[in-house]
Each structure stands twice: as C-alpha cells, then as structure tokens.
C-alpha cells in the first residue's frame, strides 16, 4: 500500500503540519483586532481568543441616548468578532495550503 518509507514520510508530514498548526494557534491567540461601529465612534479591541481588551467611546456619544450607545457597542463587538474569524481563516489557510474545512467544522480554538 505504501512504498518504502512512504508511511514514515506521511507521519513526518503530519507531525510538521501539527507543529505549524500549534504555532499558528499561539499566534492567533496573541493577535488583536479592532472592530468599529458608528463610523469609528465606538471601537472594540478583541484578542484572537475572543476576549475583549478595550472599548473606546467617542466623548460625543456620551451626550446621546443610552440605547444608541449600547447598540453601537454591541455592533462594534460583533464587528471585532467577525474580524477575528476572518483573521483565523487566513492564518489557517497558510498552514493548510488553502484547503477548506468541511462545512460546519470550526478550527480547534
């Protein structure tokens, strides 16, 4: 079924990919992205592991109504989460050579 050394080479390749995957996962966990809402009036900085690091609110919004501010914060959080997902896909594509994961499968983090 496998030629001479074929199984050994396959195992080496699998180990190399696993090592690369671990490095990329560490890199993703350390990265930070910023999501925005209200044309940048609200900004949320989030890590690759979806932890919110910082929320910035333009002072002009503090005079407006509370509900609008809450909506903008939620929208900025959602934008940051979307950007994290996009960054994760890009980083993982570097490791997998662009192979797509089956529909519904998430990355292991």
Curated annotation (Swiss-Prot):
Transmembrane segments: none annotated. InterPro entries: YbaB-like_sf, YbaB/EbfC. It holds the Pfam family YbaB_DNA_bd. Keywords: Cytoplasm, DNA-binding. Gene3D superfamilies: Nucleoid-associated protein YbaB-like domain. It comes from the Bacteria. One of its GO terms (cellular component) is cytosol. Belongs to the YbaB/EbfC family. Binds to DNA and alters its conformation. May be involved in regulation of gene expression, nucleoid organization and DNA protection. This is Nucleoid-associated protein Shew_2234. It comes from Shewanella loihica (strain ATCC BAA-1088 / PV-4). The lineage of its organism: Bacteria, Pseudomonadati, Pseudomonadota, Gammaproteobacteria, Alteromonadales.
């Amino acid at each position: 079924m496998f030629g001479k050394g074929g199984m050994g080479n396959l195992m080496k390749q699998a180990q190399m990919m696993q090592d690369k995957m671990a490095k990329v996962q560490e890199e993703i966990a350390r990265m930070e992205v910023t999501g925005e809402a209200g044309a940048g009036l609200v900004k949320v900085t989030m890590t690759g592991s979806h932890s919110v690091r910082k929320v910035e609110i333009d002072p002009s919004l503090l005079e407006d109504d509370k509900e609008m501010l809450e909506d903008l914060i939620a929208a900025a959080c959602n934008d940051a989460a979307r950007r994290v997902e996009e960054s994760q896909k890009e980083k993982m594509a570097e490791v997998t050579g662009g192979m797509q994961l089956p529909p519904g499968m998430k990355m292991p983090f």
